[in-house]
Regions:
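Transmembrane alpha-helix boundary signature
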Residues: 31, 55-67, 92-103, 161-165, ...
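Hydrophobic alpha-helical transmembrane segments in multi-pass integral membrane proteins
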Residues: 158-166, 217-226, 304-311, 383-384, ...
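Transmembrane helix-loop boundary segments of multi-pass membrane transporters
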Residues: 38-39, 57, 105-117, 134-150, ...
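Alpha-helical transmembrane segments
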Residues: 128, 132-136, 163, 188-202, ...
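Signature of multi-pass transmembrane helix bundles
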Residues: 1-56, 71-72, 76, 171, ...
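Helix-loop-helix junctions within the multi-pass membrane cores of secondary transporters/permeases
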Residues: 70-72, 79-151, 329-410
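Structural signature of hydrophobic alpha-helical transmembrane segments
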Residues: 40-52, 111-122, 169-183, 235-236, ...
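Small-residue-rich segments of transmembrane alpha-helices in multi-pass membrane proteins
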Residues: 18-22, 50, 78-86, 147-158, ...
């Protein structure tokens, strides 16, 4: 019970800043109706409860199941089994990812939803296979990233304009609440089964690699079909005048999302059952814990998605529309940055990432460090997205230089930060981006008379890119700080020798120096 209480407190810390920003906006420059505000407040409550249940359930079920599957296939001597199982897992977990379904609904009628979802799922399957092979054979992550992003940039020159933003957004939304816990745990499991000193570093980067697959797959789809999305249909905001209306609206939302979440969980559950039948990897107590965890995930994700879609989608669109009407849309930039800094903290997958980072780095890299890097990166990304909506700037003028910087930084930061940064990019662009930020951008774009597919779409892609840079900058600072500590330690030892201290005195002084922060963390 105390664990769930801690989860509630964590969720409150994440969601309340967003709620306060929206409330301040609603009583100043973005007036909301009483009905819309009521839906939003209930949505905040749903997000807090849903996130708490989801993160608790993911720790009980998705993570241990993924770890066990990863360690099992990682221990296999048959490469074709590792490759085939990884490919199937990638498709199975992605095909019903809620974030992907939300994006597909936003694209419009010109592109069939199921065609887009299947294309993205196959892309994830192929690149999960590549990611696992990288861990098994010890391939260098940065060179793989450089090669495949180069392929994506070349393909982008042959795409219709509207498909460029869609392709990069697809890479962002794929790594959502269903895929991240499972895929990252598989990476950790495969890495744990691999002997060698670098297995900790190799466990990161798997989500980042899986984000490239949908980008390239959707680009190929665009080149073949040569069509563009028509954009999202207008949001129909329910008329809410009484508390009864709000309750009925949310009950309708729950009814819609229960089957969606059940379908999203079903492939993972079926795969887990088959895995248990074949391997007998879990005992009875562990199986009961897994089942309880899956129930938590189901209930939590249903509540979370309902709160996001009913309470946050219309609010986001209203805020975007109103802000774009002030002073040529200039206020949209600072407000977007402020929202971006806090909204990433409300992503369920971010908690999973932070927890794994702390565990796999043995506490050397704290969740706070990762969270700060994510927040700064997302704030910058949404500021650039708002600038694009106002000016109509082509996304490739930001994407190409941004990834050149990100890939260039990978040569100067510790290896573990490279993998964490690319994982962070995929994790940051989750449910809240699809359910709140994308409607905000489309509302602003409509108000300014822009093209939704070329100007509003692409915000998720920028959100996925910016943390890659900001986390690596944190890694660069970590590296420089560690070097400084080493230099101070060496200078201290030289001083002891110069003044004729005995060996035991030198050791005691060196230990004291480390205790005060002068030692190396490397």
């Amino acid at each position: 019970m105390s664990i769930f209480k801690d989860k509630i407190i964590e969720s409150l810390k994440s969601v309340l800043p967003i709620a306060l920003i929206v409330i301040v906006l609603s009583i100043t420059i973005v007036p909301l109706t009483v009905g819309d505000m009521l839906l939003f407040i209930v949505g905040v409550i749903c997000l807090v409860i849903g996130m708490s249940l989801f993160t608790s359930g993911a720790e009980m079920s998705m993570q241990p199941l993924g770890m066990k599957i990863g360690s099992t296939i990682g221990a296999s001597k048959k490469i074709w089994i590792i490759a085939f199982v990884s490919f199937i897992i990638g498709i199975v977990v992605t095909i019903s990812e809620p974030d992907l379904v939300i994006l597909a609904d936003q694209v419009g009628d010109n592109i069939d939803n199921m065609v887009l979802i299947l294309t993205v799922s196959v892309g994830v399957g192929i690149f999960l296979m590549i990611a696992v092979m990288r861990i098994v054979f010890g391939w260098n992550l940065k060179y793989i990233m450089i090669a495949f992003y180069a392929v994506a940039f070349v393909l982008s020159f042959f795409l219709p304009e509207g498909f460029k933003t869609l392709a990069f957004d697809s890479g962002g939304v794929t790594t959502g609440p269903m895929t991240v816990p499972f895929i990252m745990s598989i990476g950790a499991g495969v890495s744990a089964a691999k002997a060698g000193a670098d297995n900790r570093d190799d466990s990161f980067g798997i989500t980042g690699l899986c984000s490239i697959g949908p980008i390239i797959a959707v680009m190929v789809l665009g080149i073949v079909t040569q069509v563009e999305g028509s954009g999202p249909p207008p949001t129909v905001t329910p008329e809410v005048e009484t508390s009864r209306d709000a309750v009925l609206t949310y009950l309708h939302g729950f009814a819609e999302h229960i089957p969606d979440v059940a379908i999203a969980l079903l492939p993972t559950v079926v795969f887990g059952v088959l895995f248990q039948i074949i391997t007998r990897a879990f005992n009875k107590v562990q199986i009961i814990r897994l089942v309880i965890g899956i129930v938590y995930v189901f209930v939590g994700l249903t509540i979370f998605l309902t709160g996001a879609s009913v309470g946050f989608v219309p609010t986001g669109e209203t805020i975007g529309t109103v802000l774009a009407g002030y002073h040529y849309g200039i206020p949209l930039i600072p407000v977007s940055m402020l929202l971006g800094y806090f909204i990433v903290k409300a992503e369920p997958s971010v908690y999973v990432l932070n927890k794994l980072v702390e565990n796999m780095s043995a506490g050397a890299i704290s969740g706070k460090t990762t969270g700060f890097g994510l927040s700064v990166g997302v704030a910058a990304a949404l500021g650039l997205s708002a600038l694009r909506i106002i000016t109509g700037l082509n996304i490739m003028w930001i994407i190409i230089p941004g990834y050149i910087i990100a890939l260039g930084l990978s040569f100067f930061v510790p290896k573990i930060f490279v993998g964490i940064s690319f994982d962070s990019g995929g994790v940051a662009s989750g449910t809240m981006m699809s359910a709140f930020v994308l409607p905000l951008c489309t509302g602003a774009c409509d108000q300014l008379g822009g093209n939704v597919m070329t100007d509003a779409f692409g915000c998720v892609a920028l959100v996925a890119m910016a943390p890659i840079i900001s986390i690596q900058l944190c890694g660069l600072a970590y590296k420089l700080k560690s070097r400084s500590r080493v230099r101070r330690f060496v200078m201290a030892r030289e001083t002891f020798v110069d003044y004729g201290y005995t060996h035991s005195e030198q050791r005691r002084a060196a230990a004291e120096n480390r205790r005060r922060g002068g030692g190396s963390n490397e």
